[in-house]
């Protein structure tokens, strides 16, 4: 699994930056909430070297930051990252975040990569300013893992096989009744999330370390 992720990262990072350039890794999420702590935990495991200098100048390729959440800082995460990017001038940003799944089978089993950036909080209805090239000023590679799922999605996954003989109208009416119960505001996570998020973050950290320190 580590080798597979490393190859995915290599191919995507090459699109975002040339060799011997600086990359800024951003650990999004709330460290105090286990299911949302993926980003900070990944940054904890990184071998940052941007601060290392030799007689020939700066040799390090990777720097990292954990910007926290708006409830703690009062600031849009995108504004924090943009300010750092203006100072550091990275070739690209790698943003890591926990996601909301749209299928039970993808919980803690899927690592998603995108070169279009990310919108923090959008999976749970807490829309914030997007972290993308337009807002940050440099290309943004987003890396996420689904760690939570809303109760309505679980209900749909479970009852859909039972409704296969119903008409489209009947299915929509049944599902709308479930939705009106308010379960779409409930989010759940696997009971082994503590172990899962530690293992997943370790794999991602090591993959990034291998890619950026070749």
Identify the residue ranges that each predicted region occupies.
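Conserved active-site and cofactor/substrate-binding residues in soluble primary-metabolism enzymes
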Residues: 3-4, 37, 41, 76-80, ...
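A structural-propensity feature for long, helix-poor, extended segments
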Residues: 58-90
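Extended, charged alpha/beta regions that create polyanion-binding interfaces
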Residues: 1-21
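Anionic-ligand anchoring segments at beta-strand to alpha-helix junctions in alpha/beta enzyme folds, i.e.
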Residues: 38-71
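Gly/Ser/Thr-rich loops at beta-strand to alpha-helix junctions
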Residues: 28-37, 71, 98-102
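Short glycine-rich or small-residue beta-strand-to-loop segments that form or flank ligand, phosphate
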Residues: 22-33, 64-68
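Predominant activation on well-ordered alpha-helical scaffold segments within soluble catalytic domains
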Residues: 6, 10, 40-47, 82, ...
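A structural signal for small-residue-enriched, beta-sheet-centric alpha/beta enzyme cores
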Residues: 65-66, 95-214
């Amino acid at each position: 699994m580590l080798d597979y992720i490393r190859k995915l990262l290599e191919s995507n990072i090459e699109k975002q930056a040339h060799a011997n350039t600086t990359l800024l890794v951003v650990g999004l999420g709330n460290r105090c909430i286990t299911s949302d702590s993926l980003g900070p935990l990944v940054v904890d495991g990184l071998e940052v070297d941007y601060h290392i200098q030799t007689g020939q100048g700066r040799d390090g390729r990777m720097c990292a930051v954990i910007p926290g959440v708006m409830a703690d800082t009062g600031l849009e995460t995108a504004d924090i990252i943009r300010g750092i990017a203006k100072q550091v001038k990275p070739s690209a940003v790698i943003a890591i975040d926990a996601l909301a799944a749209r299928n039970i089978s993808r919980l803690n089993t899927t690592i998603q990569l995108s070169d279009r950036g990310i919108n923090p909080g959008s999976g749970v209805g807490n829309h914030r300013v997007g972290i993308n090239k337009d807002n940050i000023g440099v290309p943004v590679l987003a890396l996420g893992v689904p760690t939570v799922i809303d109760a309505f999605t679980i209900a749909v996954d479970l009852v859909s096989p039972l409704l296969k003989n119903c008409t489209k109208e009947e299915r929509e009416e049944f599902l709308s009744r479930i939705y009106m119960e308010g379960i779409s505001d409930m989010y759940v996570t696997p009971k082994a999330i503590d172990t899962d998020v530690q293992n997943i973050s370790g794999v991602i950290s090591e993959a990034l370390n291998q890619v950026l320190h070749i």
